Amino acid sequence: MKNLTHLQRLEAEAIYVFREVAATFSNPVMLYSVGKDSSVMLHLAMKAFYPAPPPFPFLHVDTTWKFREMIEFRDAQAREKGFELLVHVNEQGVRDGIGPFTHGSNVHTHIMKTVGLRQALDKYRFDAAFGGARRDEEKSRAKERIFSFRNAQHGWDPKNQRPEMWKIYNTRVSKGESIRVFPLSNWTELDIWQYILQENIPIVPLYFAARRPVVERDGMLIMVDDDRMKLRPGEPVENRLVRFRTLGCYPLTGAIPSSAANLSDIVEEMLIARTSERQGRAIDRDEAGSMEKKKREGYF
């Protein structure tokens, strides 16, 4: 038996996790945020159950502020791959006019993402939800298990996690409780890009460098994606060569100057990167420990 490469080991672990959840939970779902990690997750899920389709639906929590290219890519992938796509919007948040400009990143994220996700999980009664979080992304995620227990209110208690020795997972939950499952926990950002290159996985074009209209605000390059973008007095819009390392709501996601226009260029760029991909996410700057607080409340 030949020795597995690093990427093959990561792939095998993720596929094992997918199959374990399918075998032990009655109503799982995959959270599909449309980013690079979600694209890798989709690819792995298709592999795990081939030639059958994944035995669970894909859930996208739409904040109504995602990049337009993300929504176009999401719908195109659903048509091409033929998976069941569920889209949920917190309609009460829409009626209340919640948005990143009017209410700030913290309130917007809580109402439109966290509360929206909890609504969808309750509506469809999912008992397990796959997510694309990785331990190298952020310190609160670094201490989270692959199988992350959530109580009936979808809350996470980092001091009450289940042991995962020898790849043996405790999948038992009581009524109303659930598990968030992270098959990519042991992957790094570089692993993700090398796997995307190796497998030729389709991704949102925003990850590739192109000239885009951006404004420099609070140390971030924010792309002007539609006419809802509120410019400050004297704030110029510049067409700059940029790409995104991470994707989310466009007013809360910063681009980076880059000329990496293909996958090989991105991998080369990642080999010398010395900053976190989440430096471009405004939601991580809300307050100290903000990500852990969000996760305790039921965030992805």
From Swiss-Prot:
One Pfam family hit: PAPS_reduct
Protein's UniProt keywords contain Transferase: yes
Record-linked SUPFAM superfamilies: Adenine nucleotide alpha hydrolases-like
InterPro entries named among the record's database cross-references: PAPS_reduct_dom, Rossmann-like_a/b/a_fold, SO4_adenylTrfase_ssu, Sulfate_adenylyltrnsfr_sub2
Alphabetical UniProt keywords: ATP-binding, Nucleotide-binding, Nucleotidyltransferase, Transferase
Region (Disordered): 281-300
Lineage: superkingdom: Bacteria
Coiled coil: none
Pathway stated in the Swiss-Prot or TrEMBL entry: Sulfur metabolism; hydrogen sulfide biosynthesis; sulfite from sulfate: step 1/3
MF-aspect GO terms: ATP binding; sulfate adenylyltransferase (ATP) activity
EC number: 2.7.7.4
Reactions catalysed according to its record: sulfate + ATP + H(+) = adenosine 5'-phosphosulfate + diphosphate
Gene3D superfamilies, A to Z: HUPs (3.40.50.620)
One record GO biological process: sulfate assimilation
Protein family (similarity comment): Belongs to the PAPS reductase family. CysD subfamily.
Family matches, as NCBIfam families: CysD, PRK05253.1, PRK12563.1
Cited function: With CysN forms the ATP sulfurylase (ATPS) that catalyzes the adenylation of sulfate producing adenosine 5'-phosphosulfate (APS) and diphosphate, the first enzymatic step in sulfur assimilation pathway. APS synthesis involves the formation of a high-energy phosphoric-sulfuric acid anhydride bond driven by GTP hydrolysis by CysN coupled to ATP hydrolysis by CysD.
Subunit structure, as described in the record: Heterodimer composed of CysD, the smaller subunit, and CysN.
Protein name per Swiss-Prot or TrEMBL: Sulfate adenylyltransferase subunit 2
Species, as recorded: Brucella abortus (strain 2308)
Gene label: cysD
